[in-house]
A protein has these predicted regions:
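N-terminal and secondary-structure boundary signal
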Residues: 2-265
Length: 265
């Protein structure tokens, strides 16, 4: 028992995904760890050492005040040019450029960039969905300024409130270069490894693995996104239980392929 919270030892041989239902609409400045704990307690969810919380990027960004009113944006010459080429709002393009270090590809309706943390994605992850609009505002939502840092702060705050080490993954839906559709992807990680090096381990026939690295944070982020959904599901936080990996914490930045080994840029 830690500060009134129940602590159990995980003994599972299966992985469970438990949505934390009832998370309210998040506003700038909200205490997100506190909201998560109160909502989980209301649902009588007991925390277990080793639990992992997958949190949708959108509520992180809202709590951090990453909302921008497009009506206040003045597009640059470059944004006007790219806006014409892609047929995108040049004000949105201006924000995309501000959030990026490099334009990777563009064509009509598509603008793929590399953001300041090395993630390659469309529109720098800037989104309009599930944002309340009115005649005076034209809101868009940016990604957290530093998703790994956001995850670390939430991880630390959850520990201070519960006395339990909870892994934290911030996930977002990102498209893939070689396949159709978006996939839940880890953009911020704390308290667990984002990637596990399996090289040197033996396969079923005793052969050593030579190149295998498992992007476990992406796998967990994708699994949670099945419950979180993309529309009006209103389930932005999912608890993953039973995944036990006793290895050092590695942030989501560990998933970014170094430039010298990237064959496609």
């Amino acid at each position: 028992m830690a500060d009134g919270f129940c602590v159990k030892k995980a003994t599972f041989k299966e992985i469970k995904l438990i949505p934390i239902d009832g998370i309210p609409l998040v506003k700038p400045g909200d205490d997100l760890p506190g909201i998560i704990i109160r909502t989980a307690n209301a649902s009588k969810i007991e925390w277990i050492e080793g639990d992992i919380l997958v949190i949708a990027q959108k509520i992180i960004s809202k709590a951090e005040g990453r909302l921008v009113n497009l009506k206040e944006i003045n597009p640059s010459k470059r944004a006007l040019e790219l806006g014409s080429l892609t047929q995108k709002d040049p004000r949105l393009v201006e924000l995309i450029l501000q959030e990026s270090t490099k334009v990777i590809r563009h064509r009509k309706g598509v603008l793929v960039v590399q953001n300041h943390h090395g993630v390659i994605l469309a529109n720098a992850g800037i989104d309009r969905s599930n944002l309340e609009q009115d005649k005076e505002q034209d809101w868009v939502l940016l990604l957290p300024k530093d998703s790994d840092l956001s995850a670390k702060k939430i991880h630390q705050e959850l520990f201070s409130k519960t006395g339990i080490h909870l892994g934290v993954i911030i996930n977002d839906s990102i498209g893939r270069a070689w396949r159709n559709g978006t996939l839940g992807t880890a953009i911020g990680v704390a308290g667990i490894p984002s990637i596990i090096d399996l090289r040197g381990r033996k396969d079923l026939f005793g052969n050593p693995l030579r190149v295998s690295e498992e992007a476990i944070a992406d796998e967990l982020a994708s699994a949670a996104s099945l419950l979180q959904g993309q529309a009006d599901e209103a389930l932005p936080v999912v608890l993953i239980r039973g995944f036990q990996k006793q290895t050092p914490s590695i942030p989501a930045s560990g998933l970014i392929r170094p430039k010298e080994t990237d064959l496609f840029q």
